[in-house]
Amino acid sequence: MRRAVCPGSFDPITNGHLDIIARASKLYDVVHVAVMINQSKKGLFEVDERIELIRQVTAEFGNVEVESFHGLLVDFCKQRDIPAIVKGLRAVSDFDYELQMAQMNIGLSGVETLFVPTNPTYSFLSSSLVKEVAAWGGDVSHLVPPAVLEALNGRLKQD
């Protein structure tokens, strides 16, 4: 069985993330979406909320499993016998950083990294940008799935 992981904080998941996960789900039998837990960073959504949103928006793929992780991604991969990490690249700056991580990961554990170029429609997109635009009342409906838009608008009204 071919397995891969798509890691990230997904705070919140965007259409760019979803595009990479969808494309990975066509290449692998099982795609694990690993939601990073970063104790030093307070997210807009709790980890459990992010997991639930990702499960909702990836349900149609049928081969995506979503869970959280804390620590080294290669340890997550080793514990689950996952030989590949799938990463989307938006720009050259992403490549510079991700190449270093990929080289470290293969050196630590033999886990390969597959770089997938982002759909040009989403080349500028990040969760941080979505949160900032939405917080100022901008329309982000074309940048996130409907379930995420609803959760995002609800959360921003609370704050």
From Swiss-Prot:
The keyword Transcription does not apply. CDD domains: PPAT (cd02163). GO terms for biological process: coenzyme A biosynthetic process. Keywords: ATP-binding, Coenzyme A biosynthesis, Cytoplasm, Magnesium, Nucleotide-binding, Nucleotidyltransferase, Transferase. Reversibly transfers an adenylyl group from ATP to 4'-phosphopantetheine, yielding dephospho-CoA (dPCoA) and pyrophosphate. Pathway: Cofactor biosynthesis; coenzyme A biosynthesis; CoA from (R)-pantothenate: step 4/5. It comes from the Bacteria. It catalyses: (R)-4'-phosphopantetheine + ATP + H(+) = 3'-dephospho-CoA + diphosphate. It is found in: Cytoplasm. Homohexamer. Substrate binds at residues 9, 41, 73, 87. GO terms for molecular function: ATP binding; pantetheine-phosphate adenylyltransferase activity. The keyword Cell inner membrane does not apply. The gene is coaD. The record marks 17 as: Transition state stabilizer. It is an enzyme of class 2 (transferase). Belongs to the bacterial CoaD family. This is Phosphopantetheine adenylyltransferase. Its main location: cytoplasm. ATP binds at residues 9-10, 17, 88-90, 98, 122-128. Its EC number is 2.7.7.3. The lineage of its organism: Bacteria, Bacillati, Actinomycetota, Actinomycetes, Kitasatosporales. Its cofactor is Mg(2+). One of its GO terms (cellular component) is cytoplasm.
